[in-house]
Amino acid sequence: MSNNPRSIIAIVPAAGIGSRMGADKPKQYLMLGQQSILGHTLDTLLAHPDIEQVIVALHPQDNYFNQLPQSQHPKLTQVVGGGERADSVLAALDYAHNYNPGAWALVHDAARPCVTHQDITQLIKSVAIHPQGAILAAPVCDTMKRSDASGLIVHTVDRSLLWHALTPQFFPVSILRTHLSAALAAQVPITDEASAMEWAGVMPGLVNGRMDNIKVTHPDDLQLAALFMSQQ
């Protein structure tokens, strides 16, 4: 693995309840074909040759995870997550730091089952040009509008430098842990790992990822994810 970190630990925050899906269980456990969304996500991460370990942060009352076949995989570790995504990531980073403080964290959304090995490998290799860390992202293609508080268009936003932030996001375990912990202590709104790094003054790299790496958020996304996976 030339120019790549020696130890890569994937982190999957999976403690959320996914209320926008309106389902009877957390969205990561909804079926996508023959197995759950989370099952597909974990299969991809566990099978990647550069990933040494996968840490899944779970809700303390999770009654579903141990029913997944992936829960018994020797590369997989469970930790108790927190109330927000960032809290779950930090809990996993604490474990990863104790395991190997020199490792790199590959943080990936549980509800992005369409991520490919090609994109993961491309992100890992980007360390050669982005030693501070990087994220998968996709350029904004739609026309972007800024509104006022009443919902009226104020102006059209220049999209030439706008990107959709995707996952995985890839940073050194110890550095991300330090910055994420400090940002949460300062009550900074953290929506992804890159935002914690940005708050600390780090400028993460952007790695162009596939547009089919969608996050399953609404019911219609399940059919779209199934279509994308059938074409990969």
Swiss-Prot record:
One Gene Ontology term from the biological process aspect of the record: isopentenyl diphosphate biosynthetic process, methylerythritol 4-phosphate pathway
Residues flagged as site, Positions MEP for the nucleophilic attack: R159, K215
Top-level EC class: transferase
Catalytic activity: 2-C-methyl-D-erythritol 4-phosphate + CTP + H(+) = 4-CDP-2-C-methyl-D-erythritol + diphosphate
Record carries keyword Membrane: no
Annotated GO MF terms: 2-C-methyl-D-erythritol 4-phosphate cytidylyltransferase activity
EC number: 2.7.7.60
Keyword vocabulary terms for this entry: Isoprene biosynthesis, Nucleotidyltransferase, Transferase
CDD domains per UniProt: CDP-ME_synthetase
Function of the molecule: Catalyzes the formation of 4-diphosphocytidyl-2-C-methyl-D-erythritol from CTP and 2-C-methyl-D-erythritol 4-phosphate (MEP).
NCBIfam families: ispD
Descriptive protein name: 2-C-methyl-D-erythritol 4-phosphate cytidylyltransferase
Species, as recorded: Shewanella frigidimarina (strain NCIMB 400)
UniProt lineage: Bacteria, Pseudomonadati, Pseudomonadota, Gammaproteobacteria, Alteromonadales
